[in-house]
Swiss-Prot record:
KW Hydrolase (keyword) present: no
Active-site positions on this chain: D63
Source domain of life: Bacteria
Keywords: Lyase
Name used for this protein in its record: Methylglyoxal synthase
Protein family (similarity comment): Belongs to the methylglyoxal synthase family.
């Protein structure tokens, strides 16, 4: 089994759903490196009795801290249960996190069913590395 670096994020109204999903997959998740934003990380530690690398709370910059880890290829999977029914004070940060995950072709799940697919994929147990898009032309463009 290859140890994955998994980022887990949930908006306040979605934390209960994420924790229920984590309980369902706790035997698998506890063997991986887990990262989370503030209070989500605390709830995960309590649920799994494992150490979680915790960032700041999302509104205090935690989403952006995870985004930096994605750019630096320090995260393998992002599981983000975001609240589709309520605007967040840090919506620009949420959008930035999701955008940067797509920019770097990171597997992302935004709900329990998609997260189930990620964890049960045959690629999950492999040394899978998503293709990194080639941005050299963009980096070298003349403005």
């Amino acid at each position: 089994m290859t140890v994955k670096k998994i980022a887990l994020v949930a908006h306040d109204r979605m934390k209960k759903e994420l924790i229920e999903w984590i309980k369902k997959h706790q035997n698998l998740l506890k063997h991986h490196e887990l990262y989370a934003t503030g209070s989500t990380g605390q709830a995960i530690e309590k649920t799994l009795n494992v150490t979680v690398t915790k960032m700041e709370s999302g509104p205090l910059g935690g989403d952006l801290q995870l985004g930096v880890k994605i750019v630096n290829k320090e995260i393998d999977i992002l599981i983000f249960f975001w609240d589709p029914l309520e605007a967040q004070p840090h919506d620009p940060d949420v959008r930035a996190l999701l955008r940067i995950a797509v920019v770097w072709n990171l597997p992302v799940a935004c709900n329990a069913s998609t997260a189930d697919y990620l964890l049960t994929s045959p690629l999950f147990d492999s040394d899978y590395h998503p293709e990194t898009p080639d941005y050299e032309a963009y980096r070298n463009r003349i403005i």
